Curated annotation (Swiss-Prot):
CDD domains listed in its UniProt record: CUB, EGF_CA
Post-translational modification comment from the UniProt entry: N-glycosylated.
Region (Interaction with the cholesterol-anchor of SHH), start-end ranges: 860-869
Keywords associated with the record: Calcium, Developmental protein, Disulfide bond, EGF-like domain, Glycoprotein, Repeat, Secreted, Signal
Signal peptide segment: 1-24
Localisation per UniProt entry: Secreted; Cell surface
Subunit (UniProt): Interacts with SHH via the cholesterol anchor of the dually lipid-modified SHH (ShhNp). Interacts with PTCH1. Forms homooligomers and heterooligomers with SCUBE1 and SCUBE3. Interacts with VEGFR2.
Name under which the protein is recorded: Signal peptide, CUB and EGF-like domain-containing protein 2
Positions of the EGF-like domain: 28-68, 69-110, 111-147, 160-196, 200-235, 269-304, 306-346, 347-385, 386-426
Protein function: Lipid-binding protein required for SHH long-range signaling by binding to the dually lipid-modified SHH (ShhNp) and by promoting ShhNp mobilization, solubilization and release from the cell membrane. Acts by enhancing the proteolytic processing (shedding) of the lipid-modified N- and C- terminal of ShhNp at the cell surface. Synergizes with DISP1 to cause an increase in SHH secretion. Probable cell surface coreceptor for VEGFR2 involved in VEGFR2-mediated angiogenesis.
Domain of life of the native organism: Eukaryota
Mutant phenotype after disruption: Zebrafish 'you class' developmental mutants are grouped together based on the anormal U-shaped morphology of the somites. Homozygous zebrafish mutants show disruption of the formation of hedgehog-sensitive muscle fates, with an altered myotomal morphology from a characteristic chevron shape to a more rounded U-shaped. One of these 'you class' mutant results from disruption of the Scube2 gene. These mutants lack slow twitch muscle and muscle pionneer cells, and PTCH1 expression within the myotome and neural tube is essentially absent.
Matches recorded under InterPro entries: cEGF, CUB_dom, EGF-like_Ca-bd_dom, EGF-like_dom, EGF-type_Asp/Asn_hydroxyl_site, EGF_Ca-bd_CS, EGF_dom, Growth_fac_rcpt_cys_sf
Amino acid sequence: MGAVWTVRLLCLFLLLLNTRQSAALPHNTDQCAEGSDACHIDAICQNTPTSYKCTCKTGFKGDGKHCEDIDECDVEYNGGCVHECNNIPGNYRCTCLDGFHLAHDGHNCLDVDECVFNNGGCQHVCVNTMGSYECRCKQGFFLSDNQHTCIHRSVEGLSCMNKEHGCGHICKESPKGGVACECRPGFELAKNQRGCILTCNHGNGGCQHICEDTEQGPICRCHVRYMLHADGRTCVERDEMAPTAPDHNATSLAEVDKRVKRRLLMETCAVNNGGCDSTCKDTSTGVRCSCPVGFTLQPDGKSCKDIDECELHNGGCDHYCRNTIGSFECSCRKGFKLLTDERSCQDIDECFFERTCDHTCVNSPGSFQCVCNKGYTLYGLAHCGDINECSFNNGGCEHTCENTMGSFGCHCRAGYKLHWNKKDCIEAEDSPLVPPPARPTLNCNKQGGGELCYLTCQSQVHISSGAEDSYTVTCGMPLPCHTGGQWNGSYCPGSGIKTIATFKSGQGKCNLKRSHENLAHSFKTALSDKRATENVQFSFVSLHCASSSRQQRSRHGRKAGEEEGSFITAQFELDVNLEEVTAEGCDLTCVRRRSEKRLRKTIRTLRKSINREQFHLHFAGSEYELAKKLVRPADTPDHCGTGQILLDKKCVKCSVGTYYDGEQGRCFLCPPGTYQDEEGQVSCDVCPGPEGRGIPETAGARNISECAGQCRPGQFSHDGFVPCLPCPQGTYQPEVGRTSCFTCGGSLTTKYDGSVSFQNCETKVQCSPGHYYNTSTHRCIRCPVGTYQMEFGQNYCIACPGNTTTDFDGSTNIMQCKNRHCGGELGEFTGYIESPNYPGNYPANIECTWTITPPPKRRILVVVPEIYLPIEDECGDYLVMRKSSLPNSVTTYETCQTYERPIAFTSRSKKLWIQFRSNEGNSGKGFQVPYVTYDEDYQELIEDIVRDGRLYASENHQEILKDKKLMRALFDVLAHPQNFFNYTAQESREMFPKSFIRFLRSKVLRFLRP
C-alpha cells in the first residue's frame, strides 16, 4: 500500500495509528487518563513526564483551568457576518434577516426572490425588491388590504374604489366620508398623508448589508470587506488586487518621457516589491511583474486580475462552475458527487444503504425511489406499511373482510361460499359446485436404472427469486375443509400431515431452467407406466433451493474439499383421506399412520431422484429441471436469479404481465387467457371464467381484472362474466367480474344505471377531501385520527398504513400518516439518531430522548448533515444536546431552525443527552444525525478540523459531510483506525476530492509536528 494512495484516502488515520502510538514515551501516572486533573471542561489535558498541562480548546480563552467562551461576534467586525452574528460555545454562526438567505461563504447575505415561488402569493404581478417584494395590480384594479389580491376599480365617487384616491399603499374610507391612507408594515406615512416612505424595518430598507434610517429614507452601507455598488443598495467584494483608478488626466506608459524611463530603470524588487501585485523579478530593463496561475497581468504591467475560468467551456465542469479568486470550483447537482478529478460528476447510489428504503430501493440518476411490496403502501417517502384494504369499501367484500399483513381476505356468512373472484358470496345450495383446484402431484418411475420424478402443478403456482442461485416455488393451497366429501370452497387447517425434508442435488446450482429434452413424452410415460413407484397428491408443496459454494461450506465447518451443489428444503402437506376410515378396520389414527408411512416412502424415492438430478417440475404447460453446471458466456459479468434478466449490467425482474423463459433467457408477454400480477415470475396464471363462450383474449394481462369476458365496472351478472347487466339506479360497482352491486344507502339514488362509484350517488351535499359522507345523517363527517381521504364525495376514510397515524382529524393524503417511533441506532462506536417518520415530516407533539455513552477514554464527534425545523413555530420544535437532562447542564448543540449547510462538532461532555420535541404547529423533514466515538488522544486534531471554516467553505466539502457512504468510511476509520487497511487503493482513489485530502493533510502534519 504505498504512501501516495495512503494519503489520498485519509493519511491522518494511518499516521495517527503508526506515529502517535509508537512515539509515546514512558511516563509516570497519567493524571489526564485517570480524570484527576484540574482542567476545565472546555480545556484539553496533556500529560507531561512530571505532571500535566491544561490548554483551552479552540474558541475558548483562559489558563486551561478556567476557560470561557470567546465571543467571536464582538471581534473581527461582527465575526465577518454582514447581518446577524450568533455566538455559540466555542464557535459562532451567521444568520440573515427576513428576505435574505445565507451565501455559500457562510457570512454574506443574498436577496431571496420571493416571486419565484407561487408568484409571491400575488394575484396579478409580483415585483421582487432587495430583502422583500411587493404585489401590483393590472390596469383597472387596485391592491386590497391584504396587499396580495386585486379589486376592480369603480370610476365614480370619491372612495377607495376610485383610482384617484392618491394613497401610496392602503386606502380606507373614513366614517365621515373621504379616504384615509395607511402604509404597509415597515413604511411610514409621508407628510402629505398620501405617500409611504420606506424604513429599515421592511426588507432591510432595500439594503443588502447595513441600513440606517434618515429623514430622507434609508441609507445603505456595506460590511468592511465589501464596497457599495453604484445602485446604492448592493454590496460587492473589494478587489484588493485591483489598482487604484488612474487619474483621467494621466498619460499612458507609452507617452512618458525619458526621465520616467530612467526612473523605471532605478526601480528594484527590493523596494515595495517593485510595485508588483504578485511576483517581481529584476531585469536589465527594470522590474518585471508576473501573476500566479489563475490571474492575468493587466496593461499597467503591475496589477493581477482574476481569470474567470468558468467563461470558457464551463471550466471543464460536468455540472456547475463557480469562479473563485485565483481559481474555480466545480460542483454537482443534488444527487451527484464530484469525482477525484474535481471535474466529473457521478450519480450517488442512495440504494447502497439497506436502510434507505424499507422494501425496495430503485436508484436513478440524481435521485432514487422507494417501492413497496404488494399489499403495502409507501409513507414518509421511504417507509412501507401494510394496507388495510378492509378500511375502504369493505375491501370490496360482499360480506365480511379480514385484513392480514400484506393482503386481506373476504369471508362469507353461513350458507354462502366465496365466488371465484374471492369477494362475492354465493349460496352454497343453489349454486353449481366449484371444482377444487388441481392438487400438486408427484409421479415417479424407474428409468435408466434410477428414479425419475415429476412434480406437477396445474394451478396456484408462485415463484420468487432470492439471492443469487436461489429460488422458492410454492404450489397448491393450504388443506381444505370437507363436508360430506364435497368441496365447500373455503379453507381450514383440516386433518392432514405436514413434514419438512432437505435434499442435496449433486453438483447442480439452483436455477429453474426450461428443459431442452423432450420431457413431455417422458412425463406422459411416467403417468401411464405400470412400473410407477409413486403417484401422490399433496395439498400444498413448498420448495426452497439454495446453492452452496465451497467457501460458504468451509466457513460453516464442512470439509473444504466437498464439491459444490444445491440443497432443496421441501415442505409437504398431505391430506388424510377420510374415506379410508372404517368403523371396524381402521380409525382416523390408523389412517394417519398409513399416510405418514406413505409420505416417508415418497421422500426416500424423491431423495434418490434429486441426488441423480432427475427431478423435474411441470407447471404452466412447461417442464423445468435443476440446471447442472452452468456454462456461461465469457462476456456475461453476473448471474441473475430466476425470473430476472441482465439489462445494462443490472439484474432486472420480468415486469407484471410477463413471464421468464429460462431456455431463451428472456421475458415474454403472458399468452391470451392468462395473467401475471407479480414481477419475476416464470409462468402466468390461468384467467378464470366459463369455457366455450368464444371470448377474445388479449396477451400481457397484468392482473385478473384484465382477463377478458368479465363484467366491467358498473356491471354485474350471476357469475361475473358476460352477458352482463348494468347496476340499477341506487347502486354502483367499482370492480370487474362481480355478481352484485353495492347500494348507495340512505335511500340515495344515482343519476343513471351502471354507476361505478359512490361518487355517482346523488348525495345531499358533496364532501370535500378529509371527510366522508354519512348515509344515516346525510352529513359530511371529518375523517377520524388515523385515517384520511384524498377524494371528493366518498363514503369512507382510508386507514393509515402499518403503525402510523395522523396528527389531527380531517387528513387529506397518506403523507399525513406518520410513524411516531423515535428512530436511530445507538452503538458504542458509531450510530445515529433520527426524527420520527424521517425522511417524511415528523409528527406533532412528539418527544424523543437519546443518550450516547461512549466507552472509556473515547469522545463523541457529531455531524449534522442538514436539519429541517420550521422557524415559523417560534422555536416550538427544537433539538438540544447537552450533558444531562438538567436544563443548566453543559450544552453542546441546540437549534430550532432549518440549516441545509452541514456542521460537525465534538461533544463538550463525555456523555450526550439528546432531546427532540415538537409542538402542534408546523412540521418539517427533521433530521438524521450520525455520530462516532474516537480515541480522546486525537481530541485536539479533531477539534482543529471541525472548527476550521475551510471544512464548510467548499460546496464539495459540504457534500462530503452529506454523503452517507463517505461518512461511513470516515467514521469507520475514526472509530477503529486499524480498519484503514480494509480499504483498497482503488477505493481510496474514488472516495474524496483532492482539495479535501489537502485540507486534512495540513491538519495532520501540524498535529504531528507542533
